[in-house]
Amino acid sequence: MERTLFLNGTIAEESWFDDDVTPQLFKEELMVGDGDITVWINSPGGDCVAAAQIYNMLMDYPHNVTVKIDGIAASAASVIAMAGTKVLVSPVSMMMIHNPMTVAMGDTAEMQKAIEMLGSVKDSIINAYEIKTGLSRAKLSHLMDAETWMDANKAVELGFADDVLARAEIPEDMEPPAVSMLYSKAAVVNSLMDKIAASCRTNPKKTEDSKPKGRSVDSLYERLNLLKN
């Protein structure tokens, strides 16, 4: 049975709340089964190295990988999409490619190192685009320099996708995917808030310790009168 994986959210090396797509989480889901897979992508991108790891996993997967873009595959997410045996895009989805970015501090030597590093990262990204599209490296470099946004038809025209998704006929008795991987930041936040709220809802029981301690005012007056007499 073909499996379906959902790659939704920002791509990162690590995740505090499992709300990002990480290579480790993706690998765990990818390796739990066998056979052909469909990967739905809706991601704004993220870490280039993490995306490269996921790309390599899909390229090395021994069965067919159908990538379907149902929202956006931008930046690093577009690199992952290139690993598909077939890439399909929704009529209302978008793809975006651009130059890699980083933050650097230091003197001119450090800045030059950062520039050279970005150049190498760009070359590695172009490798993935070139394999899929067949476009020249110069053309791909120009598209990245311009931060190119592509609708479904443009993505197919340039070779980043193979076809536009058509309306699928889904049988009523169709079973849910054998394995699904959904990273939803909203779901994680809501779950965390529910747990916090539950821990705050306490119903303290009344015990004898909760009763006021000490002597009454009347008893104090009686002792005071005795002292006066």
Predicted regions and their residues:
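N-terminal organellar transit peptides
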Residues: 1-68, 72-76, 83-96, 101-229
